Amino acid sequence: LGIDYESIKETNPNIIYTSISGYGQTGPYINRRVYDPLIQATAGSASAQNNEKPEFFRTIVFDKVTGLTAAQSISTALVQKERTGKGQYLPISMLDSALYYIWPDVMWSKTLLGEDIKYLPDLFDAFPIFKTKDKYISMILLADADFQKLCELCKSDLHTKEEFATTDKRVENLDSLISAVSEIIKDQEAEFLCRELDKFGVPVAIVNSLDEIHEDPQVIEQKSLIEITHPVAGKMRMPKPPFNFTDQNEFPKSHAPSLGDHNREILSELDVEEAD
């Protein structure tokens, strides 16, 4: 087709050209058809969920991560082009993007290599979800002071027990910790725990159901979600862009154009008569 990088570079030497593939430009997998779940499988994230069998993230995560990787790479290339006048060819693979994304936390216990390395538990094992009287909550109880505040609030002496006395001890005895904490909060309401723990800076949040997200007071305050009316689909809810520019905080409040939405407008600019 003549639209590869080398062909276009002859016409526009300083072009920034990005190509996205599943597995990269070389190797035994380059001709495979690729979907997000396949990248989750190859990159190891499906094995990182710590269940009896591998499971996928319940979202199409690496399609989106690769898009963000491309946007970041292009932005960097644009800065370099402004400084040097040179373009770039940016080959980006979903696999590399996935590995780069998950490595700092998913693979933190596999980073150091050697015979004498003591591997730590998976990071997210230390972040369980707890059941309260009415809802689920997430609490980060790594810091001694945070764990003590929870125990004091629930009138418990767990923080004085040797097996839970320090962060290392709590991580080491994680299963026992989860059971013990679940027991002392089982009769407490989630709103009460969040409100009181928040007063002392303890990291805590209610686990929203998918039907509750738009009712969360922080989401409402930030106007994180907007509602529009689509000419075909009807009324719909969607997130606003997560960034704000200094001089432009208003974002489009209409749907993406459907096929042919702007035909008349564009054709009229090309002096095509209405009758045609």
Regions found by a protein language model. Give the residues of each.
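Flexible, small-/acidic-enriched active-site or ligand-binding loops
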Residues: 165, 229-275
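Aromatic-enriched alpha-helical interface/lid elements that frame and gate functional surfaces
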Residues: 125-200, 204
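A glycine-rich dinucleotide-binding beta-alpha-beta segment and adjacent secondary-structure elements
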Residues: 199-251
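Helix N-cap/coil-helix junction residues
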Residues: 3, 156, 219, 272-273
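Alpha-helical scaffold segments in soluble metabolic enzymes
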Residues: 70-77, 149-153, 180, 212, ...
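A structural signal for well-ordered alpha-helical segments within the folded catalytic domains
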Residues: 65-72, 145-148, 175, 191, ...
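Active-site-adjacent "lid/gating" segments in soluble enzymes
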Residues: 2-137, 142
